[in-house]
Amino acid sequence: MNRRLEPLAWIVGLTLGISACSGGEDATGAKKTVKRDTIAQSEFQPSELEKTVNSLVTKIGDTAPVDLQVAVVLKQLNTYFAPMQIGANRAISELSLSGQVSAPTSSSGTEAVDEQNAIMNDELSSGYNALAVSPFETGNQPPIDAAADSNIPVITIDSDLAGSKRDLYIGTMNSEAGKTAGTTLVSLITANSGTVILLGHDDAGWPDGFDRTMGAKGVLESAGFNVVVRKTDRSETGEAADLDALATAITDADPPVVGMMGMFSNAYRCAIAAETAGKTGDDIAIAAFDFEPKTVEFMRSGLIKATHAQRQYYMGYLTPYVLYGFKALGKEATKSILKPQMVDDFRFNTGLDIIPAAKLDSYYSYLDSLGIGSSN
C-alpha cells in the first residue's frame, strides 16, 4: 500500500523493553497478563480476525508467563512494510516482551538476501528465541531451517518459503484475494454479460501474480463474462505498452468491455486506458488493488469504483501473539485457535479490505486509528 504515512525512522532494530513478567514461568502461579490497546470501532475492522486474536489472548491469559524474545525481520521498514512494523511493535508491547523489528538496508538482489540472513543469524546467536521473517527468496532458507532445528518457532509473513521448516505463514492468499476481487467487480458491473479485461499476470512462473489473476478470472467467467488477461509489463517502458494494449483492447472488444480490474499496484493504468478510449465510469466498472496516488485520484473522480488492500498491519500484529502462543500453549493448540483463518496446516489467511470509492475517507480514518496512515 503506497500512501502518505506518518514519519517513520529508518531503524534497523527497534527494541522494546522486557517487563518483569516475561522472565520465565512465575513461581507464584500468576497468570500472563495481556492488555490490548483500544482501537476505535470501524466498519473496516476485520471482525473475524479480531475474534481470533481475542480467543488467542484469552487462552494465553490462562497460562503462566514464559520467556520469549521476538525477532521480526522484514524486507524494508518503510512504505508497504511500515504497517507490519507498527503492528508487530504494538503486539510486542501488549505482551510485555523483548522484541526487535529489523530490516536490511538493501531492498533487492543478493546483497539484500545476504544482509537479511546476517540479521537473522546475529539475532538468533544473541538469544532471540522466536523468529518471524518476510523472506526475499529461497536463499533465506538456511537461517530459517537452522532456527527450526534449534526448536525456535518460525513464522514467515507476507511472503512465504513453503519448502522451508517454518511453522506457519501469515499473509495474503493470492488465489483467495483474486476471488474476492472478482466478486467485488461482479457486484459493480451492471450488465449481465460482456468483456472484462484484467491487467494481471497469466504466466505460472510468478505464482503469486498468476494465482491472484486466475482467482479473479474464474469468478468472472463463472458469472458469465468473457475475460481477457493483459499480462502487465513491468519494464521501464511498460506503462506506455500497457496503456496502448489496454486502449486497443477496449476499442476492439466484442462483446464490449463492461469491466476492468488491475490486479496489482499499477491498477490505475486501467483507468487511464479507459479515458484514452473515451470511456467513463458509467461505461466501464473498474476495480483496483492497493493505493497508488493515481489510483486514489481515479477513485475520487469516480472512474475507479473500488480498491482492495492487503492487511499488513494485522500480518505484523498477529505474529508476536502467534509466536507467544506456540511457546505458551504449544503449536497444535495455537493452530487450533487460528483455525477460522487457516487454509491448511501451515498457512493463515489475513484476507483483504474492500474499499468502495465512496468510503475512501472513512477507510483513511480507520487506518489513522491503527496508527498507520493519514488521509490523502
Locate predicted features.
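Bacterial signal peptide processing site
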Residues: 22-25
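Hinge/cleft segment of the Venus flytrap/periplasmic-binding protein
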Residues: 29-66, 220-223, 318-376
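Extracytoplasmic "Venus flytrap"
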Residues: 39-63, 67-87, 91, 95, ...
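An alpha-beta-alpha
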Residues: 70, 74, 88, 180-232, ...
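Hydrophobic alpha-helical
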Residues: 121, 130-149, 216, 234-298
